[in-house]
Amino acid sequence: MDMTDAPLLATQANGVGHLRLNRPRALNALDHAMVRAMARALDTWRDDPAIRLILLEGEGGRAFCAGGDVRQGRQMLVEGNGAALIDFLAEEYALNGAIAALEKPWVSLIDGVCMGGGIGVSVHGSHRVVTEHALLAMPETTIGLFPDVGSSFVLSRMPGAMGEWLGLTGARLRGAEAVEAGFATHFVPREALPALREALLAGDIGAIGRTAQPVPPGPVAALRPVVDRCFGAGSIPAIVAALEAEETDWAQEQLAVLRRVSPTSLFVTHEMLRLARGLDLPGCLAMDLALARSVTPYPDFAEGVRALLVDKDNAPRWTPPSIEDVSPTTIQAMFG
């Protein structure tokens, strides 16, 4: 295979380790080979004194990384190989933890879609640079899963109930909104990205601070009062009731999302964010893996991926079908 066809391109020069996610037709979704290759590169560069920073990008111009390859994960389940899916997730979560533990700058240039696993390989690093074309989200409730890759550690520490809103609805943040929320650290206009990349590849980490533009309070800050009022209500039924009481277009849109995603995933996500507030990142990643063992075999994951990404009929048949039918006993069992 030509190296330029490899799913991960890893090079080093000028004291910089450069990683490029290279599955543009799959929006750079992470598969097992990519996770293993990233982990190998990180293992090599972590203790190499010649490497002063690591730069991560996505190839193709459309996406940084659209997430883990959940279609592949669903196929593993359908073929009766759920153990392979858990093995993949275990290695992915270990990579997330290794990025967080790195004592060197880990710089992600996010100029396009960044969701799920893409958040996982960026948010735990030191520098997350977004452009106005960046689109960030944790939309796992849409596919019957939960916000994993250690994102519960980040979501649970956002101001007020911002993490509950983003984790439950999968709301999308554009550009500087991701800095406001805490997923990103710096905003740089796309037109300034080539010069910034060149400076970073020359080992100039200070170029980020010189290039980044200030992010004043904007749309995310403006939503804080209603987000806190509704998504801080304390339980999924209480959140629904609070949104119904708002009688605004925004509240109705959020209600529609909550009625559309997996009811079971909503309850799992709400509980995991509650627990995450008392955990460190390794604890959150351990919770992710334990939950993955109980949630991925549950019907909603395979069904959610089928409806959104395989058959694309956007008509998932959830188990159970509504928020009102979710059993607290079922949710508690998933947490062991």
Give names to the regions the model predicted:
Residues 1-57, 97, 333:
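Conserved CoA-thioester-binding segment of acyl-CoA-metabolizing enzymes
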Residues 56, 69, 121-122, 177-178, ...:
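Hydrophobic/aromatic residues within transmembrane alpha-helices
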Residues 58-94, 144:
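Glycine- (often His-adjacent) and acidic-residue-rich active-site loop
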Residues 99-143, 165-166, 170, 175:
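Glycine-rich beta-to-alpha active-site loop
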Residues 148-205:
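Contiguous mid-protein beta-loop-alpha structural module that forms a pocket-lining wall or clamp
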Residues 183-261:
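Amphipathic alpha-helical blocks and their helix-capping loop/short-beta junctions
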Residues 243-249, 258, 262-336:
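Long, low-complexity C-terminal extensions of enzymes
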